[in-house]
Amino acid sequence: MITNDLGIYIHIPFCVRKCPYCGFLSAPPESESQIGLYVDALVREIGMAGSAYGPGRQADTVFVGGGTPSVLEPGQIQKIFGALRDSFTITGDPEITIEANPGTLTKEKLKAFRDCGINRLSMGVQSLDDDILARLGRIHRKRDVFSCYKMARDAGFENINLDLMFGLAGQSRKIWEKTLDEALALEPEHLSFYSLQIEEGTPFYDLYKAGRLDEASDEEERRMHHMAISAAEAAGLVHYEISNSAKSGRQCRHNLKYWSMEEYLGLGLGAHSYLRRVDLSEDACEEEKGADEFNRAEEKSAADAAGYSDITGCRGIRYNNEEDMAGYLGSIARGALPVDGKSAAADTEKDAMGIYVFTALRKRSGVDLEDFRRCFGKGFFQAFPQAEAHVARWQEQGLAEIITDTGSSVPGPAETKEEKSRSSSPAETKEGGYFRLTEKGIDKSNDIMSEFV
């Protein structure tokens, strides 16, 4: 169910050393002073964004990502969160996450995190095999993970995620199984497990193009993925999204916003935003940064919103901040939000429906058919008439299912004219229901999800 509460993402683009597989907007600082200059600019952006977006809105999740946010000093983190609380209304029970590299954590930093209200720690472990960590270019080793995990528990963190990677060169199933066993023995509340993605522009991509990068086969990656799901389940973590498992009530609320088409505001270098209500002053985006494009997208989104009594049902606008550090700092120095107006685009109805389904199918709960109807004013199979045959085939193959709210399975798309005119699915004609992938269907998720975008 889409809610009105905002998610806030804060980007810290610095790291100690760029990993050779990393395609994110991050790099080691160019000088000792650059981090301080960036934090000062970020604090100013938070204040400007609070004036532009904050009135009347409240945020229930905050996610500080990177890069490696834990490279910041305690005073810098405190400055950022002081500005955040001065500029935005944070709900009484927020989820506030910070990403951390075990090689950069100290007791002092962890205490500062807790003092700032950060209540969720996401540790970039990746592997618990030192040889693999070295190949990945990571600055930490296995012993650092265990010592930092203990420090985090001692500091009062009761919600910890461990990030792991599979499909890596030299990573046998035995090594992966050992990593899973040792990670889960720590009893984290959340486990993320991602296959290695070869990103263009990275050293790993160059090795791949030159035929010098060992890769796991697709079949091997599938086996490793299911190993993670099974191991996590045995440890009491429920598989709730393709690459994530969590204890009950510990699903990542912020990331669920991305997978549920809820609004999020990105702050910092290159940060992305998705908002349904955007009404910025004319100087919010500088002319040379694409103010005309941004204003057109804003007007289109506003016109669409006027047709909806329920704001959560309307389509939104997507854009990102300036990705060049000099450009980002320059915009803020001139008193303008660092928005890259040329990136702004208002969703069409087709875009919005496709993204809704694509992201919802990442979740094990799948597409909430009642919520889809509420958002778009039409049933799922009315919106995607071509999907009827696909869904029937996927059901026959055991790749997908339609279930009612009570958990009972529905054979397939409705066949009667009356049902088709209303919603085209028995699950939609009753008290709601869900269209979701089965565990087997997750292996074909990319093929299935691509049918809707």
Regions found by a protein language model. Give the residues of each.
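Short, amphipathic alpha-helical interaction segments positioned at domain boundaries
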Residues: 439-453
